[in-house]
Amino acid sequence: MTDKPSKTQTSFLRRLLVAYLIDTGKNTVPLIIEATGMPRRTAQDTIKALHEIEIKVEQFNRGEYRISDWGAVNRNWIKNNFTHVCSVLSYPYKME
């Protein structure tokens, strides 16, 4: 039996994914959109919401972001579960 993921789960996983993408060089809204296909507003709102899960993101240069602190989040979990996260979110992204 496969259950549809809850909005809470997808919101949390989307935040983890966006933080991971920023940390691995997909650090602008256009690059995140290109990688995932998510709408621009979703990408922007997700970046703005990262602080809610204690991930600190900084904007530098023009429109570029970087993660300055992962807080309690284990970055390696996202790396190791990348395919699962993309699958739950229905994002086609593949690591290069």
Which ranges hold each PLM region?
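Short, Lys/Arg-rich nucleic-acid/phosphate-binding segment
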Residues: Q59-R66, W70
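Long, low-complexity, charge-rich intrinsically disordered regions
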Residues: M1-D3, K7, S68-E96
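Alpha-helical residues within the helix-turn-helix
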Residues: L31-A35, H51-E52
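A short, conserved structural fragment
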Residues: H51-F60
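Short, leucine-enriched amphipathic alpha-helices that occur as contiguous helical runs
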Residues: S11-V18
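Short capping segments at the starts of secondary-structure elements
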Residues: D23-T28
